[in-house]
Amino acid sequence: MPKLEMMLLVLLILPLSSFSAAGEQVVQGDRRSDGLARYLQRGGRDVQECQVVTPGSKWGRCCLNRVCGPMCCPASHCYCIYHRGKGHGCSC
């Protein structure tokens, strides 16, 4: 089987969603494993300041901790925790 035909066959078998836009393979899992994946990837993220979304809210846009997903805690003494069934939250 020629190489071109083999490559086309492989592309038909593999789902396109298993690759990122950069061509890297991504791992998909259930909701419980997503937190672990974010935790393992957080080392490559640049640390920036969090911005509070709304006054009085304990959530800000996440820059400090990948475990919190798209959010983070606005105070430096707070940290992100995960409650089974409830999701991520801040503990201050």
From Swiss-Prot:
First-listed, main subcellular location of the protein, grouped into a coarse class: secreted
Propeptide: 25-45
Membrane spanning residue stretches: none
Tissue specificity of this protein: Expressed by the venom duct.
The UniProt record lists the keyword Secreted: yes
Similarity annotation: Belongs to the conotoxin D superfamily.
Protein name in the entry: Alpha-conotoxin-like Mi20.1
Organism for this UniProt entry: Conus miles (Soldier cone)
